[in-house]
């Protein structure tokens, strides 16, 4: 166990110490004075409730992508509270022109109450995959983590999560994991200039805002 500096943690994680940032506020409001570290042991696997049947772990996705479907490349897409929209479709369809498979992971453990329930967002994706997207090349599975609203740093975290699930490419749109005006809308693109694909273990595909 060890003590830590809240202000130092906030600045280096979120790029700000402003308490109006929800992540910074959580550090001061929810975290104690002492942190712990060390080996992690799984005692009981948490049940994901309505998403348990759709749950996939990295060992499942690696087997599905490369042993069963024989993919060579897979693009991952982690999406938060917003329901599926045309901007998402643009990213997905562009990716499918370049890679063998698309792996969509909607977050189902969000930090704040949303207008659209997680179950409905998952149903919307399932409907589109069953009726519109190339079904054999598109895989849907929930991701039970929450946004921490770290903007560009969270985009890097999500890219690493996608890599761990077996993706070769990470799809990052504008203002990924952003909140309010704390990060400009392409900060999550620019942070990847600091890393090579070899360092991250995954290629990153960046998408700008589109309109029609």
Give the role of each language-model region:
Residues 1-84, 88-212:
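Active-site cores that bind ATP or allylic diphosphates and position pyrophosphate for catalysis
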């Amino acid at each position: 166990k060890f003590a830590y500096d809240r202000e130092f943690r906030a600045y280096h994680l979120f790029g700000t110490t402003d308490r109006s940032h929800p992540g910074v506020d959580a550090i001061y409001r929810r975290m104690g004075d002492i942190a712990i570290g060390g080996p992690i042991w799984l005692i009981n696997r948490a049940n994901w409730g309505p998403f348990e049947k759709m749950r996939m772990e990295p060992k499942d996705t690696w087997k599905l992508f490369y042993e069963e479907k024989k993919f060579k490349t897979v693009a991952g897409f982690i999406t938060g509270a917003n329901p599926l929209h045309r901007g998402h479709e643009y990213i997905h369809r562009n990716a499918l022109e370049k890679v063998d498979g698309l792996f969509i992971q909607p977050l189902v453990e969000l930090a704040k109450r949303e207008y659209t329930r997680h179950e409905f967002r998952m149903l919307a994706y399932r409907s589109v995959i069953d009726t519109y997207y190339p079904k054999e090349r598109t895989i849907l599975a929930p991701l039970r983590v929450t946004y921490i609203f770290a903007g560009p740093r969270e985009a890097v975290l999500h890219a690493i999560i996608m890599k761990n699930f077996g993706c070769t490419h990470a799809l990052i749109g504008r203002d990924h994991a952003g909140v309010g005006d704390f990060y400009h809308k392409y900060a999550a693109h620019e942070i990847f200039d600091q890393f090579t694909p070899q360092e991250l273990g995954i290629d990153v595909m960046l998408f700008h805002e589109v309109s029609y």
